[in-house]
Structures are given as C-alpha cells and as structure tokens.
C-alpha cells in the first residue's frame, strides 16, 4: 500500500477548491489508477470530490450518508431517519454500478460524539456510571445514539512523541461499504510497528 498526499492551494477558497477538484480528479485517477482509494480531510470539499469520483468510477472512504446522498442525487428530508436515506443511497449505487467503491460512516461521528459525551458526563454527575473503564463507558454511551453501529474506544498515542495521552482517546466505528458489507474496523488490532511512526510539526 502506498500513500499519496494531494493538497488544494490554500488561497483557492471554497469555490476555487471545488473547481480545482473538478479539473484534477480525472488526472489523479489517470496517474494513480481506478483502484486508488481517496480520503478527504475537509468536510467542505467531500461532496464535490465524491461527485467527480461517481462520474469517473473512482473510490472514496470516510464519507457520511448525507455526503453520498448529495453526490448521487438522492433527495431527503432534514428530519428523515438515516436508515431510510441509506436504503435509497444503496439503490442508487447499485443502479450506477458502483457497488463496493464507497465506504461510509453510517452514524455521524460529530452527532454521536456530542450526544455520547454528554450522556457520559450525565452518568458521572448523577452517579450512574456502571463501567470503571472510561473506554468501555464511552463506547456504551456512544452506542445509545447510533443504531446498528459498533464503536471502539482505544488509547490515544501522540504521533510526535510516541507516548500515550491519558486524557485523550481514539474512537473507531465500523465502515459500511455501499452495496456490499461492513468492514469490522472495531475488531482490528492496531499493529505496534505503526506506533513508532513519527510526524514532525509542519
């Protein structure tokens, strides 16, 4: 596996970034191949990138159900249940013959983290915390707000120092591959060799 970092010029702005994605996605796929898995760290640009990948038979990991719906032209109501939107997204993926090319987080990490952490704090304040291990207790609280999604909370390692940070955690959820299956991310052990990788400050 090889990793490549592609960066949009900072001065582009939102519209400029979208135009940049539109003109460069075909080049990226041509250069790195159709089996290149894209991952976008900027929420603002993810739908634009996914639209391009949908039209060019590309691959993307890390989108959410709403990103997919917008990129595929699936309409939904603001108060609609996510499971109903996901069903229509799956149908659109099958229709466009893109099964297995997009990995999504079925539950919104921002939504679940906000409610899960609030529930965790409430249990502490009201003396209702049953689990002594913070990681198990957090996973249990997150599960209340994410039907059908499994969570795993693990120690966080600072990649600059290689040391565990006691008041931070890493949070994982399983990833659903549209039209196929779920990747059991929460069952995986993080290989020790990757903990030795160091990232310098930019």
From Swiss-Prot:
Protein name (Swiss-Prot/TrEMBL): Uncharacterized protein TP_0014
Phylogenetic placement of the source organism: Bacteria, Pseudomonadati, Spirochaetota, Spirochaetia, Spirochaetales
A Pfam family reported for this protein in Swiss-Prot or TrEMBL: DUF3798
